[in-house]
Amino acid sequence: MIVAILGAGPAGMSCANACLSFGLTPVVIERHAQVGGIQRANFHENLWMLGSPGETGQSLTERLAEHFHSLAVRTLFRTTVQHIQSAAQGGFDLQLRSEGQVASTLHTDAIVLCTGMRPRATPELLALADASTRVVIGPLNAVIRDHMCAARVLILGGGDNALDHARFLAERGNRVTVCTRTRFSGRETLLAACRAHPLITLRPDCRADTFMAQAQGVAAHWPDDEQVEPFDWLLVMFGYQPNSEVVTCFDPAIRPERDARGHVQVDGWLRTTVSGVYAAGDVIDNVQPAVPTAIAQGLAAAKAIERGRHHGGQVPFGGLNH
């Protein structure tokens, strides 16, 4: 039984490993040249992986990748899915395009969506980041660690990541302004630490309406001030959004449903609304998105496929309760 796994982050690698144990044949499809997903750029300590105190996301990813590469798993790198349709003989036909190669078709019996998530930003801020290297989208960027020193930094966002990075940067001599459109929603301990730090300014109900790229930074214009305020760096911390656009590659008749925030909808067995299609990791709505969560769900998705096979085929969304 062939299982196509879309994405080679922690969820995808875990799913492939588990498929082998369950007698399934995984084929991993990864659009980048490496495994690991966004954790490849995570220089922060991973607080959620029990048994690995002090280990960064990058180091953890290296360990996962080393194990994954030791497995007998067919992995298609630099490959994107162009279209997915039901196959006449059952299962699915995936039209693939690999970099530098002609288009190809892969027939599979099941599909697992493990495409992860990416930092969220408005189209205007994404365009600004394309125009200026002084604009950083999201927390997983080594520029934050290696190049922001004794500088003026503006952080947009009011959650844990925004406050945690304000503290991280202030401790390295940066003067940090944190701007959120409403109130701060981060943990109270982080908020208290930021309030107490002399190099951090917190601005709730702050609605900067214009940002302009400059030679050595970014200028921000506040609606209540006729002047612009210069910063050396702009850091956008608006959280994350799921990489669920892959569902648009499915034929409309078999397109998995998404919720209002774009997460792929699944039941307790990680089955989507389409029989034979599963999803795991950050592409679905999790109580706590984290590497351990993704690893566990990759395993669970493989188990669900194996269990469905022993129940006479794929079980529909919400079924197989026992």
Language-model segments: residues:
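A conserved FAD-binding loop/helix module that cradles the flavin
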Residues: 17-18, 165, 280-322
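Phosphate-coordination loops involved in phosphoryl transfer and adenosine-cofactor binding
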Residues: 2, 78, 149-152, 205, ...
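Glycine-rich dinucleotide-binding loop and its adjacent helix/turn
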Residues: 115-167, 172, 264-267
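FAD-site-proximal beta/loop scaffold in flavoenzymes
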Residues: 129-147, 237-290
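A Rossmann-like FAD-binding core segment of flavoenzymes
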Residues: 65-108, 171-263, 307-322
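Beta1-alpha1 glycine-rich phosphate/pyrophosphate-binding loop at the start
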Residues: 2-73, 163-188, 258-259
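Nucleotide donor/acceptor-binding cores
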Residues: 1, 24, 110, 150-153
